[in-house]
A protein has these predicted regions:
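Acidic/histidine-rich helix-loop elements
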Residues: 124-143, 169-172, 211-218, 333-359, ...
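Active-site region of glycoside hydrolase catalytic domains
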Residues: 220-357, 363-386, 406, 413-416
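Aromatic-rich peripheral "rim/lid" segments of glycoside hydrolase catalytic domains that contact
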Residues: 391-448
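An active-site-proximal structural segment forming one wall of the substrate-binding cleft
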Residues: 139-159, 169, 173-202, 206-248, ...
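Solvent-exposed loop/turn segments at secondary-structure junctions
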Residues: 125-130, 158, 164-169, 202-206, ...
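Ser/Thr-rich, Pro/Gly/Ala-heavy low-complexity intrinsically disordered linkers and tails
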Residues: 1, 5-107
Length: 448
């Protein structure tokens, strides 16, 4: 989401719609850290791993019942059981660890194979992307490791971390303390056995040139600034393993031919920026050379993105390492809208689930699935969610459950990764516990 308004816990977009590594240099990673990806991995330790994922000094394992994946995404050795990440010298299936290289840029990443491992995700919304006073400026608590561990214990596999960088930068240099804070949160996520997504979020709208003239046009200044920030972010995270995915933009990239926010889409500038993002990150070394990257759809909108003019960037790392970002808040009158105006032609709806509404959802996800297949790029549904509403527009609980379940199922059956937008309304910021409604939707979703 972009600039946000808090509506009963759902952040509504005004656009519509210090650790250098995963573990300390001497830390022993538990070989069973990713148990649950594909069974129970063998017990034991993988030895001491370098903070940049370089070498394993020969850990041991007592075996186990998993068919693959000792070490999980955290350790210096091992392979992710889903087949998404494969180290060259790691322990697999509870076998003993051995010595030698176990990570770094010699790993192989297959975005499509990662889909199952990424599972069901959530955002830490209205927090590190705050453009006022950062982490707690929008009434959110400080992110704690206990909260992150709680997310993992409740079944979350992916955590998206929206970030405002430019707001707090000085002369184009990202604030060092804020960079370290983001790195700390990412380290907690990966140590808990989950995947992290870090982006440049709305951040005041500079990517879209929202305050420029003409607005919503791509300028050389924007391109230079964008590349500069991704050089800094890429360098800072170069030693963090492939369980970190970098995302170029949020709901930006919505440049138009007439300078209007909702004007005629101008897709070539978005293609150019997606290419700039991929090329810039790949050049920053370490894991960036081959990590999975998430490129932006046009305003992350299905119908505006799934068109011939939208193209997938050329990746210096080869094919199969990119995801496409799409968000889903249809119908917005049910999921987001909080105020009716006089003679409003699109009034708020407090219920969802008619045959027509279900057909719209299925049609859009079918289109998205076809788009993914045609463009040969898997999808991360980086945001979806529905407000609880306030009187007199409180959303019916059964409808909220039905909508969240339908979106999650439509995603899972098509190999799309669903990532909930949450600001503490559905998931406790203390221990990661789910609301009763989200729990029902989560329980009903099974990934193939």
């Amino acid at each position: 989401m972009g600039p946000v308004l808090v509506v009963s816990g759902l952040a509504c977009s005004s656009e519509g719609g210090s650790g250098g590594g995963i573990q300390s240099a001497a830390g022993a990673a538990t070989a069973g850290a990713s148990a649950g990806r594909a069974g129970i991995a063998g017990s034991g330790t993988s030895g001491s791993a370098s903070s940049n994922g370089g070498t394993s000094s020969g850990g041991t394992s007592s075996g186990g019942t998993s068919s693959g994946g000792a070490g999980g995404p955290n350790g210096g050795s091992g392979a992710a059981a889903s087949g998404g990440l494969t180290g060259s010298g790691g322990a697999v299936g509870g076998a003993s660890g051995g010595s030698g290289a176990s990570g770094g840029s010699n790993q192989t990443v297959d975005a499509k194979a990662l889909v199952k491992a990424l599972g069901f995700g959530t955002n830490i919304g209205n927090t590190l992307e705050n453009t006022a006073t950062w982490e707690t400026g929008w009434s959110q608590p400080v992110i704690t490791q206990a909260f992150i561990n709680g997310l993992a214990s409740h079944g979350i596999k992916t955590v998206r971390v929206p970030v405002a960088w430019d707001t707090y930068a000085k002369s184009g240099v990202i604030d060092a303390a804020k960079m370290e804070r983001v790195k700390q949160v990412v380290s907690w996520i990966t140590l808990a056995g989950m995947y992290a997504i870090v982006n440049i979020h709305w951040d005041g709208g500079w990517i879209n040139n929202e305050k420029g003239s003409p607005a919503f046009s791509l300028t050389n200044e924007i391109k230079t600034k964008f590349s500069n920030y991704w050089k800094q972010i890429g360098t800072a995270f170069s030693g963090v393993g492939h369980q970190l995915i970098l995302e170029g933009m949020n709901e930006e990239g919505s440049w138009t031919t007439d300078g209007q926010k909702y004007g005629t889409p101008n897709i070539p500038p978005l293609n150019e920026m997606n290419q700039l993002f991929v090329s810039t990150v790949r050049a920053q070394g370490g894991y960036n050379a081959t990590r999975a990257l998430l490129i932006a759809g046009f305003n992350t909108d299905i119908e505006k993105t799934c068109v011939p003019a939208f193209t997938v960037p050329t990746d210096p790392a080869g094919t199969g390492k990119l995801f496409l970002s799409i968000h889903y808040y249809t119908p917005w009158t049910f999921t987001i809208k909080d105020t009716n105006e006089a003679n409003d032609t699109q009034p708020i709806s407090t219920t969802w689930g008619s045959a027509a509404e279900q057909k719209t959802l299925e049609d859009l996800f079918s289109k998205l699935g076809t788009c993914s297949s045609d463009k040969k790029i898997p999808i991360i549904l980086g945001e979806f969610g529905v407000t609880r509403g306030t009187a007199p527009y409180v959303r019916e609980a059964a409808s909220r459950i039905a909508w969240m379940t339908a979106v999650a199922k439509a995603s899972a059956t098509r190999g799309i990764v669903p990532v909930l937008w949450d600001t503490g309304s559905e998931i406790s910021r203390v221990d990661g516990a789910f609301s009763a409604e989200l729990q029902q939707a989560f329980n009903a979703t099974r990934f193939p």
